[in-house]
Amino acid sequence: MSTDQPAVGSIFDLYKIGAGPSSSHSIGTERAARRFLARQPTPPASVRVTLFGSLAATGRGHLTDQGIRRALDGIPVEIVWDTDAGNLKHPNTIRFDALGVGGRATNSWTVYSIGGGNLRDDSGPVGDDEPARYSHRTVTELLALCEAQGLSFWQLVEKTERAPWPRLETIWEAMEASVRRGLDSRENFLPGPLKLARKARTTLLRGRDLASPQRDLALLAAFALAVSEENAAGGTIVTAPSCGAAGVLPGMLYYYHTVKGLPRRDILEALATAGLFGSVIRANASISGAEVGCQGEVGSACSMAAAAGAQLLGGTLRQIEYAAEIGMEHHLGLTCDPIEGYVQIPCIERNMTACLRAAECAVFALLTDGRHLVSFDDVIDVMYRTGADLQSAYRETARGGLAELWRRRMSGQSKAGAATAAPAEHHSYCD
């Protein structure tokens, strides 16, 4: 397990409002560029930014360079995409070099975008992360503490965090807005070369006239798709725990609030509980697809949403823990292989299916007494170890899996087109 943090940090280090499409490749790198500029005694003549590992492999599709240029505020920037460097301390490594008038480096800084928009350098955490707030590191310990003190998970958050409710209200408002924008969008396609069709609005329009349970499934799907499509379009979302998995938890909560009519306070309490589980994952493993694959992003999001759903259904502490465990256990080994490096295929549909699965996990957990053989903490440990075993091709480098299949397909079409001298035809596949 990761041992960088002594205990579980604030849930507000997990929930960040920002622009998609990637928390590590977009939000994190832009934050790093701003931080680097603030460190300079005088503005440099220019800046050279070298992106390594996953950032170099998929950064163009994640709009990494655009965010860096925006953060450096008009200073000339050279972006170097180094996909060959090995022995990196983290797959999302960035080096900033401040350059003088003659092009000589006057100041350098290496920083790591570790997921969820969070940063770390060789000295430790970077930025405005709050101090660790929870006295324990595992859900097992936190659950025992809650039982001993007669607290729910959300009450533990209330007791531990600094003024949580106004901050959670702000987070929820941003989540709600991202769902509504995604549903209201009249754009037919997402940006990028895939020309992927938006499906949230049509899913909503077609699904709301169905009979239950199909209607409920369709609405959950539409809400999750809405946020994921907004994220892919570079819209404002909340990391939960990342941009690439930002549709799962809001989709679940929006459904219970708008369809089932649960009051806003219940939603905020569920958001607090989900944040606690996500923070445990962040402290003990990783929420970065570049480090552990998509199990750390969508798997974590499903786990968080399952915990939230179980709480909204009236689950006990142990039933909530069980729901979260199921949500992660059945995403173990999930790869991160985005086609062309864009947070679109398989990411958007994956958010949708994880939202549906989270709802199922919550319902099933409440049909039990909450006792089970593999704990939430056990499965988080296995997730982290599994991620370490994944080849780099399956950790956000767009070199394996679906990304490789697509690349071979496009290469074959290019060769066929060159042989016949016919103009290239853009295909729209099932996604």
Regions found by a protein language model. Give the residues of each.
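Non-transmembrane, aqueous-exposed alpha-helical and coiled segments at domain scale
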Residues: S2-A7, F12-K16, E30-L55, G61, ...
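Alpha-helical support elements that line or immediately flank enzyme active sites
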Residues: S26-R39, P250-G261, A306-G314
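Accessory "access/gating" subregions that flank catalytic or transport cores
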Residues: P166, E176-G289, G293, G401-D431
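C-terminal regulatory domains involved in ligand/effector binding and gene-expression control
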Residues: G74-D209, L219
